[in-house]
Amino acid sequence: MSNNEINNNISMSKNIERPKFPKRAVITAGMPYGNKELHLGHIGGVFVHADAFARFLRDRIGKDNVIFVSGTDCYGSPISENYRQLVEKGEFKGTIEEYVQHYHKLQKEVLDKYNISLNLFGASGLGRAKEIHREMSLDFIETLYKHNHLKKLTTSQFYDTEYDVLLNGRQVVGRCPIAGCSSDKGYADECSLGHQYMPSDLIDPKSTLSGKKPAMVDVTNWYFNLDEFHDLLGQWVEQ
């Protein structure tokens, strides 16, 4: 390397700004559903990256200024559906809360074995975290309602006439209507390969409860008016 090249490299290195770090930081890792044990994909695909970042920031800005949190997601149709199937087969006895508590404990044990440095691994539907989630969710919805950011919409939803119950996304199984899709399972509005569609387009739908074709009924729910925030979100992304 010539003297000119060395001098140019030195000059370039002087112009590189040091990274700026926040005074405090909250690091989060995706919350696994409370119906399964953690596997290598969870650890390597979610927690290791967040753990490395949390450890790095603790070294830079001090451990007291970094909080690394995650937890068990206690809500969702996969949990309720798996719980129902196990109870019907006689493979689990207890409440759905006890079912989730069982897997929450197993998940925490696995994370401890891998030495993932979480400050808190909670559970959205258990203990004090359950109370906090309820309070925060209520406050969030009431604030949106007060500022007219919610609207009522009527949509079609699957209904099992034999069990007299509305079916959630995982309680309906059929074939994906997207052309060329090779998925072996299509659920209410999304197949196992991630294609999304309207529930009415699902081919040959069957209720996992009765095994029969469910009816379609109109259901009215509150929806967040995301369109109102299009410009604001665009500005935020540009920043």
Annotate each PLM feature.
Residues 3-238:
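N-terminal, positively charged nucleic-acid-binding surface of large information/translation enzymes
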